[in-house]
Amino acid sequence: MKNPDTDKQNGLFQADPADLTESKIESRRLFSGAVFDLEVDRVKLPNGKPSKRELIRHKGAVAVVPLFPDRTVAVEEQFRYAVGRILIEIPAGKLDSPDEDREEAALRELREETGLIAGKLTCLGDYFGSPAIVDERITLYLATELSEGERSLDDDEFLSVRRIPLSDLADAILRGEIPDGKTQAALSRVMLMVERGQI
């Protein structure tokens, strides 16, 4: 799969990178946590002037669309403390380390959260939720040829799993009922693949 971050020949990127790219002058770490680090960087802008960037550094994550032959998808309902509400999301989780194999992480998170085992995993590309301040790269996958296994939730995980038709999820996205960005992005890609006969 071509990487749109580095491949200018994909037909979308037209600007000269030199006209847009910022370069780091120095970096200062303010906080190191279990999930993310907080840094402040001084950078040089394309016009040569200095500026400052406040950044959240994250080790990365994966998210999976478990698609059954009847075009239903296993999704989760989970309370998200940061936004104070229950969200509908696809199975997802952070990497154990920045260099962890992402496919293995996707298979692990799918199995732990839903009990599902994927016979086939297809990469859908990467998703950046808030690239102005966070470097978290979420790699999205489509899981098919599913079989049942056993869930193994972490001690601090509380979620319910159910199957919803892909078409109903599309309607819910249009109604604004699925505000989670990675879930919107991954489901939209799968819907396009279905429309184009790719799956």
Regions found by a protein language model. Give the residues of each.
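Nudix hydrolase/Nudix homology domain
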Residues: 2-22, 27, 49, 86, ...
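Conserved Nudix-box catalytic region and its N-terminal flanking loop in Nudix hydrolases
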Residues: 2-8, 19, 53, 63-108, ...
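Acidic, metal-coordinating catalytic segment for phosphate/diphosphate chemistry
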Residues: 26-63, 69
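Short beta-strand micro-motifs in enzyme catalytic cores
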Residues: 37-41, 86, 137-139
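Active-site/binding-pocket entry motifs
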Residues: 44, 81, 147-148
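Unchanged
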Residues: 51, 60-63, 68, 94-181
